[in-house]
Amino acid sequence: MANTANKPNDLVKEDYDLIVIGSGCAGLTCAIQARELGLKPVILEKMETFGGNSMRASSGMNASETIVQLKHGIVEDWHDFYEETYKGGGKLNDPELLEYFASHGALAIDWLAAHGIVLDDLTITGGMSKMRTHRPKSLAPIGAFLVNNLMKRAKELEIPVVCGVKAERLLTDEKGAVCGVKTAQRNVYAKAVVLATGGFTASKDLIAKYRTDLKAYRTTNHAGATGDGIKLAEEVGAEVMQMDLVQVHPTVQQDTDHVYLIGEAVRGEGAVLVDGNGKRFVNELSTRRIVSGAITALKEKSAYLVFDSQVKKRVKAVDFYQKQGLVVEAKTLEELAKKLNVKENDLEQTLEKWNQAVEKKQDSEFGRKTGMERELNQAPYYAIHIAPAIHYTMGGLHIDKQTHVLDKSGNVISGLFACGEVCGGLHGNNRIGGNSISETIIFGRQAGMRAAAEIKK
């Protein structure tokens, strides 16, 4: 989809009902929901193109108790989703945020479907026991699919999305309520502001401040993920939380100048990880924290994702990876082993043992229980060299379940809301794959609804 966003000189109005800062899935969802409730919002985006970090999301959107799951024969309770996310986050998740999140996923899927954005295929990600990761039937990467479709709806609703405008400061009135944004072009006023600016994975200063041990790590995120919303909110007294909780994603291709995240759906559809000897070393669908730690513990501190043509067909993102030259392809396992410079017999034995585990539905080596729907036995065979990289910041602004930003005393900062990765507390010390996109839609809607309700009082 072409970039249909406005440019700074198109920002002719000085006031709106609602200013949304950030044009990823959270910001777009928030603005659409607010507009449909009668507000006149504007979206300000500092980058020259819309979509933010959401454009890089690949695997899908987690939700439980959905119609889609029932069509696939999956019956479950959202409380199980809650418990697995809570466990996956080291039980450091904010229970109130997590309960709202886990119990509103199906509504978010339905809301998207009502807007013609249908996610009717399922896969699974690490840390989940059931297929909850919703994606389009085309198997297209979730991020660009959602952003482009949400942008279409924003255009239909005549919501201005203005790129190239950086928020320099939040404006407050005499009572301390947030009432607008200072930009290089002008002051823009509104009855409320929503921060949907993403995390700080691309901020060397903030990473160095909160996680010195990760200073040398590369990031999967785009250059705009610099924690702007956190800084803006702190200037008006907002509290931050869990800022040291930074996620390292285990499967990132880093052999070129550009860093490429290899989505969790590749493992969810059956790929295995092997070390430099061609042997498995971990349950590939453990949490990202565990898998990253296992890779880092290897002598080479990297590994290979190995899969076959069946997995490739189930994950369309692999076509993109191939176009970028990231995928090693071979007609046989023997040929693949030679290309990877691993022992042929070891790789063949690894796949033979894995296929037996799939057939028996029992992984006696590492206890993997998911992503075992099909054996890896259909040539051609493929491999991608991966290593861990910074991927997500679980910490951020302290919000309540109504998406109000809170100050250091736990009080609501009037007129200020936040949604998406800019917020802390939801994920604990490890974000489950597929939960970030869910967060953007669930809490993006919530921010739009709450802002509309309070502005209309």
Where are these regions (language model features)?
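Conserved N-terminal/central alpha/beta ligand/cofactor-binding core
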Residues: 5-10, 40, 46-160, 164-169, ...
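Core beta-strand elements of the Rossmann-like FAD/NAD(P) dinucleotide-binding domain
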Residues: 13-16, 184-192
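A glycine-rich dinucleotide-binding beta-alpha-beta segment and adjacent secondary-structure elements
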Residues: 169, 346-430
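Glycine-rich loop(s) and the adjacent beta-strand/alpha-helix scaffold that form part
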Residues: 188-252, 446
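Internal hydrophobic alpha-helix adjacent to the cofactor/substrate pocket in enzyme cavities
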Residues: 232-239, 348, 440-457
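N-terminal Rossmann-like FAD-binding beta1-loop-alpha1 element of flavoenzymes
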Residues: 18-43
